[in-house]
């Protein structure tokens, strides 16, 4: 590092070595140091004489970095311009990590902004609620005149910004995915005094236009402290603009990482975003690859000597307080369904159910009809109590469209347990004779609306999707996103690209044809699990009573005529957006052909819902493993299991569908269940409290619903807590969230049933292991119906069965 004769560092400020170390390491300065230091120094880059590609600072692992001691701050501060890893190819830390570190540093508020979207907003909101830290929402807009950072001044500001982002994405059509924003004047009109615009040094040439358009009261001068020599010049430019236009001034270090250890990944992402490698991009990166969250004392120490430095920090805290709000203030509802005069949604649902029930049960016994009447009355009472008639009418409308256009479909999921769903024609399994429990689908204790997935013959699913868009309007319906994250192959590829390796080597490592170098492996491990880009969910759609853009921005998908929200299914559920899954299924297309062929050649109309699920001929055929071509049970493992399981009832098929899957096979559940099923081994439970949940599967956990039931019975979880546990134990597990739930589970075990010690450990370990592979019983029920239907055609109409498959 260069030093002048007066012992001064960068920016001409006196700087002791201890102060330099404190600034670069991120540790809090002493009171004396904080009073005397006003600017940072930049560590000289390491010289590496190894041939390219050379190891980069990004390869430092979290475990290589010394653990920082708990930090406190005596200077209040809030960070208003930070990035999580949902700022694709920029942020190096998850939103949860950013929030936890902000809380640890004592920050009063945090803003995580993303480029042209709110991709991680819901995860940010949930994490901040857990840590009890104020949330500020905003975004960076890629305008023609530069990147404009906007902060929302409350829920109305959020809605307006989301609409603007949506309009910028959607007006470009299906093929140009770069959003296009209007000029500053139009943006200001859209904001209508509900945004703050951050004016930084990069926008100096547009300062007059921005202030003129938005008004000085809505523009804030943002001093960026990047801990680099250029800070002094940037701060001077911003403070001059503030003086010229009479603007409030705030300060930010625009962190793209939670801690110093995380910041090293940011350089690799920055290089990839610029289509360069680290060696060529390093000059444009901050020291150590990126900036990370700092507390008020550290920010104050890094500011150049200015008369109003303390005011800038105080302004930052004030703006954070003014802009803070929680996303639950924008909770949406389902759209209202148009019903005939004299009816409301509930009365029309009741009318429709009873009218259709008579036709659906016309061929059933009078004794069953009496049970059906009582069951439907009960279910309608529950639906009315929970105020869900609109949900059922929407699903019914989609199913009616399919049937009216000769598209075979059926409801999947726990809807198979509902007599109302069967009466409406949503499902094809009669639940009472099959012994299915309605409470598994809907109960007064349920948190949130029911979940009905609709399987549609795959060749015509697009018609159903476009029906939803046309019926409710493009502004009120959209598909759910799927966040593609780095897995091994993608992580290896991007890590090697960032490190400058040739494409041939990268391809070989990605294909596992050769082992990558250690430095590639280490960097790839940092990439794994991070968001890479958005894609489209297989069939999930959300429908809203207001423009969806009021809740979350919408953009075009790569697929023709598909628009997609910027959140995945979990984020949509957290925000209160109700998802409807329209899923393509090839077997339904085959069954449709079989039904048509029987009608054509035999003159018989086959209604799938009228088939007798107790037909012993079908179960005998399956028990002989005569199941080639039958849905879900024709694999080698299924054919080997069928003669051992000897299915005799419909529930046996439900178990067969769930049992022969990679998870239960690897988890060792198959043989114990079959032995218990055949009376070889006794049925046992780890604790008596598990019997209600596991009795029907002979003490062997098979279904996801059983996990939730165990949490309620054994640990006293509420229905909402149990569902939260199920989601937390899914594929995207958060260690911190799991730790909190583990404590709640152990506490609940002891308080509810006096369980502790080894038994508690066994239950928790089984829960966590089972959650990774447990198949939903609701889906098993629907798949089992397709097993039976396809087997029925195989037994009674083998020629039509074979042609239908072809």
Model-derived regions: residue spans:
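Histidine-centered catalytic micro-motifs
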Residues: 77-86, 253-256, 538, 776-780
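Anion (oxyanion) recognition and catalysis
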Residues: 103, 129, 191, 215, ...
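Conserved active-site carboxylates
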Residues: 1-84, 98-109, 136, 140-225, ...
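Short secondary-structure boundary/capping segments
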Residues: 125-128, 237-238, 264-269, 425-427, ...
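Acidic, metal-coordinating catalytic cores used for nucleic-acid/nucleotide bond scission
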Residues: 115-120, 227-231, 256-259, 483-487, ...
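Active-site-adjacent beta->alpha loops and helix N-cap segments on the catalytic face
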Residues: 91-95, 117-127, 230-237
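Noncatalytic, beta-rich nucleic-acid-contacting surfaces in large DNA/RNA-processing enzymes
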Residues: 13, 75, 108-112, 128-132, ...
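Short acidic/histidine-rich active-site segments
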Residues: 248-261, 411-414, 537
